[in-house]
Amino acid sequence: MRRLKKIKVPRMIKKPFSQAEMEHLRCNAECQRDIAIMAFLYSTAARIGEVVRLNRKDIDWGNKEVIIYGEKGKKERRVYLTDDCAYHLHKYLLSRDDTNPALFVSNKKPHTRLGKQAIQSMLRTLGQKTEIHAHPHKFRRTLLTDAGNRGIPLQEIQMYAGHQKPDTTMMYVTVSEENVRASFRRYIA
């Protein structure tokens, strides 16, 4: 029996959002909840399954942090809220008139906990409206890439993302050509 050669499939580099795309999405969001969700996804780099399980009480407003209970491996990790995220999340929570403990709920009564599909659908609709390919995991990729490009060590990014292996983190971090050029000039040229 002959062995078949493995076909090499070129790996597509998945691009993060640009700052302009993030702002365009925010400006076209339907409501405060949607802005808060996008800010939260970016700030925490949380997986969508982790976000939909969160409750209001999980937010530590004093330290602007959240303990995420991971769906992968059931481990927990601490993530932080940017000032922008804390502002939009607080504004959203103040606008709610329900008693549901869930962090994110539907806009219409009876205000049920949002599921993965609801957030994915909201982002897909917003993406079609703005002509930007938008999905929850792209916010995670964007934050991890931004962290790498701003000089945060890979080991710290790995810990923040909840990855077991640095290789996994490296698949998320897209190094900018500008940073490569600057490093070359600083250390080599």
Label each residue range with its predicted role.
Residues 1-189:
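Conserved catalytic core of the tyrosine transesterase superfamily
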